[in-house]
C-alpha cells in the first residue's frame, strides 16, 4: 500500500514539477461532494433521509422529488427507486452530466426519484447496535441486503409518498437483491410496478471478471488476505489517484482501462473527463463476507444463499444443512432486461440462463458492445437504455 502511495506521489510530483504525464485537468467540483451536494450542485431539489433496517443498519436515502423542468407541477408523480450495484453507491446514478445521468433524466421527465444505498458502502456504514470497527457489523452479504435493506427502504418510500407501488431500477447487484427480495417476499413484490434490470446478475457461472479468479482462494486464506470486515472501501489513496494522478492527460486512459479490466472494455463510449468523479466515489466498499459469497456463487454456478461453511452452521441459519437456492421463477413482477455483450461480470451466457426463468419478462435488449459499467456511465446510455425506461414508465401511467 505504501509503495503504491509512494509511486502515485512520485507521479504527481514529476507531473507538477516537470510537466511529465501531461497537464493536470481542472478537477470536477463533485469530487469532494456528498450525494446531496452533487444533486443540488446541478440545480435539482434534494431530500435526504435515514432508513433504519430491522437489524439496525442505518441507510442514507436521497430523493429528487421533481426536475428542473417541471417544478411547477405539484401533483403526485410516479415513484422510481434506483438501486446501485456491487462496490458502488447512489452516486452512480448522478456521476455524469444531467443529460447523461439516469436520476436527473427521470426527474426531468416528471418522476419522483429515490436513490438507495446498500449496507456497508460509504453512505450506509452505521448500525444501532454495532460499530463499523466490529466484526459483527460486517457479517452480511447480499442475502441481508435483500432481506432487510430493500424492504425497509421500499416501505419507507411507500409511506413517505403515499403511493402503493413504485418502479424499481437495479444495476448489477441491485438486480441480484431485487430477484431475491421479490421472489421470497410476496408482499414486497406487490409494491413493485415494474422491475428494470440493467446488467442483471443471478448466477455467475460464466463470469470472466476478477471475482472468477478469487474463487480459487480458500475461505481461511481469503480472510487472512482481506480480513473479516470491510472489503475495498474508498480511502485517501483512491481520492489521491482520482485528483492528482488519473486527472493527467497521459494517465487518464490508463486509469480508465483499470476500471474496464473488472467489468469489460468499451473505451470509445467512456467519458474520460468524468473519470475523477467516478474514481472519487468508487469503490464505495462492501463486506468481505459479501465478496466471499460471490466467489461461492462462481464456484457453485448456482443462485443460492451464503454458505456458512459447515452443515451445523447452515442449520443454525437456514434450518437445513445446505444453503437454500433462490428461485427466480417465483417472481411475478413484470421485468424489463438490458444486458451487454461485452460484460465480464454479467456474462451473456448467465443472462441467457436467467431469461427463460423469468415468468413475466416484458422486454429484453442485448447491447452487443456494452460492458458492465456502460449502463451507468456510457455516453450513449440515454439512447441505448434510459429513453426506453422513460417511455415504458410513461406508458404505464396511461
UniProtKB/Swiss-Prot annotation:
GO terms for molecular function: lipid binding; malate dehydrogenase activity; triacylglycerol lipase activity. Pfam families: Abhydrolase_1 (PF00561). Gene3D superfamilies: alpha/beta hydrolase (3.40.50.1820). It comes from the Eukaryota. It comes from Homo sapiens (Human). It is an enzyme of class 3 (hydrolase). Belongs to the AB hydrolase superfamily. Lipase family. Its EC number is 3.1.1.3. This is Gastric triacylglycerol lipase. Disulfide bonds join 246-255. Catalyzes the hydrolysis of triacylglycerols to yield free fatty acids, diacylglycerol, monoacylglycerol, and glycerol. Shows a preferential hydrolysis at the sn-3 position of triacylglycerol. It is found in: Secreted. It catalyses: a triacylglycerol + H2O = a diacylglycerol + a fatty acid + H(+); 1,2,3-tri-(9Z-octadecenoyl)-glycerol + H2O = 1,2-di-(9Z-octadecenoyl)-sn-glycerol + (9Z)-octadecenoate + H(+); 1,2,3-trioctanoylglycerol + H2O = 1,2-dioctanoyl-sn-glycerol + octanoate + H(+). The active site is at 172 (nucleophile), 343 (charge relay system), 372 (charge relay system). One of its GO terms (cellular component) is extracellular region. GO terms for biological process: lipid catabolic process; malate metabolic process; triglyceride metabolic process. Residues 78-377 form the AB hydrolase-1 domain.
Amino acid at each position: 500500500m505504501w509503495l503504491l502511495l509512494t509511486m502515485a506521489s512520485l507521479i504527481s510530483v514529476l507531473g507538477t514539477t516537470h510537466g511529465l504525464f501531461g497537464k493536470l485537468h481542472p478537477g470536477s467540483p463533485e469530487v469532494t461532494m456528498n450525494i446531496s451536494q452533487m444533486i443540488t450542485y446541478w440545480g435539482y431539489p434534494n431530500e435526504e433521509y435515514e432508513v433504519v433496517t430491522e437489524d439496525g443498519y442505518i441507510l442514507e436515502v436521497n430523493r429528487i422529488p421533481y426536475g428542473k423542468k417541471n417544478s411547477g407541477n405539484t401533483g403526485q408523480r410516479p415513484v422510481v427507486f434506483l438501486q446501485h450495484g456491487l462496490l458502488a453507491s447512489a452516486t452512480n446514478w448522478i456521476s455524469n452530466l444531467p443529460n447523461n445521468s439516469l436520476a436527473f433524466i427521470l426527474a426531468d421527465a416528471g418522476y419522483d426519484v429515490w436513490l438507495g444505498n446498500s449496507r456497508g458502502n460509504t453512505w450506509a456504514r452505521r448500525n444501532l447496535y454495532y460499530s463499523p470497527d466490529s466484526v459483527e457489523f460486517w457479517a452480511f452479504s447480499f442475502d441481508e441486503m435483500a432481506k432487510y435493506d430493500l424492504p425497509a427502504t421500499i416501505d419507507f418510500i411507500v409511506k413517505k409518498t403515499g403511493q402503493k407501488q413504485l418502479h424499481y431500477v437495479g444495476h448489477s447487484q441491485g438486480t441480484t437483491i431485487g430477484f431475491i427480495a421479490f421472489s421470497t417476499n410476496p408482499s414486497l413484490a406487490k409494491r413493485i410496478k415494474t422491475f428494470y434490470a440493467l446488467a442483471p446478475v443471478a448466477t455467475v457461472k460464466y463470469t470472466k471478471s476478477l471475482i472468477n479468479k478469487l474463487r480459487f482462494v480458500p475461505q481461511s486464506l481469503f480472510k487472512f488476505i482481506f480480513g473479516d470486515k470491510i472489503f475495498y472501501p474508498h480511502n485517501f489513496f483512491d481520492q489521491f489517484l482520482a485528483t492528482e494522478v488519473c486527472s493527467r492527460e497521459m494517465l487518464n486512459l490508463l486509469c480508465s482501462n483499470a476500471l474496464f479490466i473488472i467489468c469489460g472494455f468499451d473505451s470509445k463510449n467512456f467519458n474520460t473527463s468524468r473519470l475523477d468523479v467516478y474514481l472519487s466515489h468508487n469503490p464505495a466498499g462492501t463486506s468481505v463476507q459479501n465478496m466471499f459469497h460471490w466467489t461461492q456463487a462462481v464456484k457453485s454456478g448456482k443462485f443460492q444463499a451464503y454458505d456458512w461453511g459447515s452443515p451445523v452452521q447452515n442449520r443454525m441459519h437456514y434450518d437445513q444443512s445446505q444453503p437454500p437456492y433462490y428461485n427466480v421463477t417465483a417472481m411475478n413482477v413484470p421485468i424489463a432486461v438490458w444486458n451487454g455483450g461485452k460484460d465480464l461480470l454479467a456474462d451473456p451466457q448467465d443472462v441467457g440462463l436467467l431469461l427463460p426463468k423469468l415468468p413475466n419478462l416484458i422486454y429484453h435488449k442485448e447491447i452487443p458492445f456494452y460492458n458492465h459499467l456502460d449502463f451507468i456511465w456510457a455516453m450513449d446510455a440515454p439512447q441505448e437504455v434510459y429513453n426506453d425506461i422513460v417511455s415504458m414508465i410513461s406508458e404505464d401511467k396511461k
